[in-house]
Structure formats: C-alpha cells, structure tokens
Amino acid sequence: MHVFAISAVVITVSVIMGAIAFAVLIVRKRWLSIAQLAVFGGLCFAAAELLKPLLPRPYLINLESNPNNSAPSGHVILAAAASVMLLCAVPRVLRALVAVIGWAYTVLVGLSVIAAQWHRPTDVIMALLIVGGLALLALATTFASGMDGPGTRVSSASVQIVGSVMLTIGVLGILYGAYIIWQIQPGLAMSAEWTNAGAYVSTALLTAAVSALVLGITLAMRQLTASPLTKLGLVGAPPAPPKR
C-alpha cells in the first residue's frame, strides 16, 4: 500500500489510465465522448485545486494538527477520476472489470494518503463524493455517439452482478461505518485508546464503501446511457418495413 503514498506513482498511474481512456475513445471514434470526459476531467482538477484554499478546516477535537485545510484530497480525486474516465470509455464487455479495478485502485490510494498522514478520512470521502457527483452530471449529458452501436445495445450480466454487489457493499458499508463512529464518538473527544480499533476499522470500511458506491453508481449509469431501457436503445432500431 505504501507505494501509493508516493505522489509520482499516483500521478503516473492515473495519467496512464486517462490516456488509455482517450485512446480507446479515439479508436472507437467517439468524438463527443472525448469532449465529455475532457470537461469532466477539467472539473475534477478544478475542484481539487480551487476548493482546498477556499474551504475552512473545521475544529473536531482537541488535537494538535495542521490548521490548513486539506480537503478534498487531490490524489484521491485524480485516482477516482481516472477510474471513472476509463470506465466510461471502454466497451460493454469490459465495464464491470474496469469498475472493480478502478475501485481497488481508488481504495488503495485513499487508504495510503490517510496512512501517510497527508489527509484526514473526511478529505478522502469528500474527494470521492465530488468525483461521483461530477461523473453523474457528465453521464447525464451523454450524446448519441456515447451509446453502444445499433444491434449491440443489450443488457450485461456482468454489469448487473458487479453493479449490484458494489452498490450493496457501498450502502451497507456506509451504514456500518457510521454505526462504529457513533459507538466510539464519546471517546474520540478524549483520544481514548479504546477508540483506536474502531477508528481504523471505520476509516477503512468507509473508504472502501464510498468508493464502491461511487464506482457502482457510475457503472450502472454508464450502462444505462450506453443502452437505454427502450426498444430503440436496448435492442437497436426495429426493422423497417420493406419498400415497394
């Protein structure tokens, strides 16, 4: 995990993922999708750079720490955005696999920056939610060229299974993580040692759960925009009557 606490590694891996995404779209000749993902990436970059100096760093407990704001995490935004871009670029047969790979990569980066004491857990959660929200807005503006080709607009068993599992893990993980925080909250203000285990578990659980929720929703939304649930979108255009 410590390798993802190296800034150059995260930047390099994320840039490679983004480059692969654009290369796939160029090969598939999805020109409007290229513009769509370029705007999405630009907004994610702007959020990482502009929000940090503007947002306050709230006082949580009586603990000596850096007073400067560290939210949202730029490295997590970069990793999550690269994962989303690759997920939106690949064809249907690869979407579920890319979602799982992107989830694992994002979780590793998120936990690494927390373990390296670059960020608080809330910085990572905020970054994930920002990317998820921007991804949904971007997918809501999907053009016709972003759909699967006529005749290939079909449902995907892998997307249904993986998407359902990720969404379930996300929702249940967030609920259980919130329950753990509620249980240890009385001791956090006093930095009680008995809260350490709960803090570690809730941090890892919420990072993994929110990542799963973001990638799971993005996976489902991408499938819906690529193969809308209509006769025209799901199975392609109906055959035209013969001309006389």
Write out the residue ranges for each language-model feature.
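Arginine residue identity/basic-tract feature
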Residues: 28-30, 57, 92-95, 120, ...
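Hydrophobic alpha-helical bundle signature of multipass membrane enzymes
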Residues: 1-66, 87-88, 188-236
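Membrane-embedded catalytic cores of phosphoryl/pyrophosphoryl-handling enzymes
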Residues: 63-202
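Membrane-interfacial, low-structure loops and terminal tails that flank and connect transmembrane helices
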Residues: 145-160, 226-242
